[in-house]
Amino acid sequence: QSKDYSFEKIQYKVGRRAYNYLMSKEINTTSLFQSILEAQKNNELPPVEKWNPPLCENVDMKIARDGKWFFKNSPIGREKMVKLFSTVIRFDDDGFYYLVTPVEKIQLKVEDKPFVIKTFNKEVIDGKEAYLFQTNVDDIVTLSNENPLRVEIDKKTQEPSPYILVRKNLEALISRNVFYQLVEEAKLNSKTQELEINSGGDVFSLGKVI
């Protein structure tokens, strides 16, 4: 009975084809999907930080640097499924990412960050122009001191890797195309020789001019 109930809810939220896809991959979707969907009844993110379920081992899931999801090296092409999974990602103190539900957790292999910024827009918020970023799973993040931007420079290649905080300790890699657009809009700080953008009154550095 619980399996039928779970299937009906999954069918409504993520589609029968998505459900059958994971069923064919031998993942325990009944508990996984039902746990996620129950936690999302009020359109809120599940409280993954409160859950401490046992680890479900030997599940090969990966998020590539470009944000694409894989299961056993096969791409997960169902957008609704990926969006659903993205709501229960947790980054633990052991340095690993997990998909977490009340009944089980699955370790994720993440090549860089679990999210990727694909586009941005500028809007006036409280009388100030701010940058709004959109992730590959359609999260909207307003650049601010609460959701800051930072840039890491590779010591060998000197290539920048820009990130923005999405929620808690989960960051998104800003795609190269978006970063180049930000650089074009940035203003040079003559004192620090850094390129800066202003979002809602908060200033963020994109790096020094070489």
Describe these PLM feature segments.
Residues 1-22:
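N-terminal amphipathic/basic-hydrophobic helices that include classical n-h-c signal peptides
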Residues 15, 21-210:
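Long, non-globular segments of proteins
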